[in-house]
């Protein structure tokens, strides 16, 4: 049975912009994730698996943190997941960029202002835009997958298991956590 696994990265703040979409103000936070053949949290994500599934991130939610119920991760699309983490943000314009995946977090400003977490995100983005010394914003992909046994070559990369992705659930925004993949690996906002 596939399990949900969360893969975390850092946000690159250089290209934050504002757009009006559907008559509403949005922050657009460019982000990169899932570099090919990366090992994160002990799992190897092969280029073949990423290439086969990354487009599934288009239109997914971008919750604040990975939603949980009683300490267990749940889909961001479940009622509990929506109630726990939705701040008016979702993922758009997903595409392959070199050996990694580019996507944008579109944050509906009015919706984000309705929750403490959404307001905290807006404040953090404003601080980053001002050049204040604040913690970076990280992101984290959640995928439903099976953990397969690695072969000898895959184990040599540091992998304890190999991801067989079934589907992508979401790409979360993290304000108080560090990503599993780093900017040095080409990941983040």
Roles of regions detected by a PLM:
Residues 1-189:
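Signature of dsDNA virion morphogenesis modules
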């Amino acid at each position: 049975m596939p399990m949900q696994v969360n893969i975390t990265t850092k946000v690159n703040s250089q290209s934050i912009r504002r757009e009006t979409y559907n008559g509403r103000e949005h922050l657009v936070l460019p982000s990169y994730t899932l570099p090919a053949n990366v090992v994160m949290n002990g799992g190897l994500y092969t280029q073949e698996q990423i290439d086969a599934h990354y487009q599934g991130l288009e239109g997914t939610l971008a919750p604040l943190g990975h939603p949980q119920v009683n300490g267990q991760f749940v889909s961001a699309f479940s009622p509990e997941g929506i109630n726990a983490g939705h701040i008016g943000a979702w993922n758009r314009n997903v595409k392959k960029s070199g050996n990694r995946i580019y996507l944008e977090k579109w944050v509906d400003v009015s919706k984000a202002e309705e929750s403490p977490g959404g307001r905290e995100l807006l404040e953090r983005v404003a601080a980053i835009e001002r050049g204040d010394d604040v913690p970076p914003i990280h992101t984290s992909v959640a995928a439903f997958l099976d953990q397969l046994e690695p072969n000898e070559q895959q184990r040599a990369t540091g992998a304890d298991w190999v991801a067989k992705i079934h589907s992508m659930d979401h790409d979360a925004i993290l304000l108080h956590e560090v990503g599993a993949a780093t900017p040095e690996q080409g990941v983040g906002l």
